[in-house]
Amino acid sequence: MSQAAAQQPSRKKTVISLLVLLALTCIIVFIFKDHWAEITMALAQLSVWQVLAVLAVGLSYPLLEGCVAWVIVRSRLPQFTLRQGLDVGWCGTFGNVVTLGAGAVPVQLYYLHKAGLSLGPGAGLMTLEYVFHKTTVLLYATVMLLLQHRWLSANTTGVMRYLPMAYAVVAVIIVALVLLCVSPLVQNLARWLLGFLPKTEKWQQRRADWLEQLEVLGTESRRLLADKPRCLKIFALQALKLFGLFCLPYLCIRFMGLSPLGFWQVQLLTSLMLFVSNALPNVAGMGSIETAFLLVFGSFLEQGEVMSVLMLYRIASYYVVFAASAVGFFIAQRHLVQMEPPKEG
């Protein structure tokens, strides 16, 4: 694992990413322009305390991601503190946006490397954090579907009927990712398939890098999965993180007085929305969520209503979170200067 794999976003890339983010935001505002009067009217109904409650729930997501990072990294660095875990969470959120979705892990690896964790194990642990997240998304959506599939079947028409197909596709991808981490058989299959890459110097170098990453991933997964109590803590934190995120649309709907949808119905719809968004392309976390949200909730809310809820939901779960992560990222850099790298356990 090379030093280049762990890096901070450059100032030039950050500026370019912010300009892209601004352009995407302008596109969304333009798409919503025909319903802007309804959106502003719905937002104007909110009290200060309601807005603060929604924003607080939105900020719980990156904070809980930091808690997950803390629990995972302590399997390697017992002296790794909760504050450092929160730093890693903020670095991931900030890096994901300013590198247009490509740099969350490299930014986190830079921090972890400075904190004393080797690049290989660090990459393995951050990959496993992602796998735990995807697995929890799959389990959460599956439980919600099992408990409420009759209600969903009775209240969906048109394009929503394709949800089971989208669910199956994403589920297969997530299961394959999990097996790649935990199954020696699948790992050996992956090594065998890598042997069919072109015999050029460029592709053989990539093959060597991927084989090294696969070896590290297998080692770290065996080490982490052997610690069952730690895995249960990780799943519990991941589930709590998703629960808070899925509460956001319900709070938005209730505070705006828009729909009689029940709490658990909104939990189901939001879990499906996040699930479907995994199958859609995105830039810096934008595009896929908006499309999936309009698709799923559009069957239960009027067009102006669903856009109003989406606007508040994205302000709380994306824009405010990104602004907070920018502050958190620069605080994390100050922490790096102060810390003495601990030894791996």
Q: Can you say where each PLM-predicted feature lies in the sequence?
A:
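Membrane-interface helix starts
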Residues: 13-16, 45-53, 222-236
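Membrane-water interface at transmembrane helix exits
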Residues: 29, 40, 69, 73-77, ...
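A short amphipathic helical element positioned immediately N-terminal to and/or at the very start
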Residues: 37-45, 213-226
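Hydrophobic alpha-helical transmembrane segments
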Residues: 51-55, 82, 86, 123, ...
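Transmembrane helical segments that form the transport core of multi-pass membrane transport proteins
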Residues: 221-272, 280
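Membrane-embedded helical hairpins/re-entrant loop segments and their flanking transmembrane helices
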Residues: 64-94, 252-269
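Transmembrane helix-loop-helix hairpins in multi-pass inner-membrane proteins
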Residues: 1-41, 92-204, 282, 286-345
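Membrane-helix interface segments
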Residues: 10-11, 47-49, 78-87, 118-119, ...
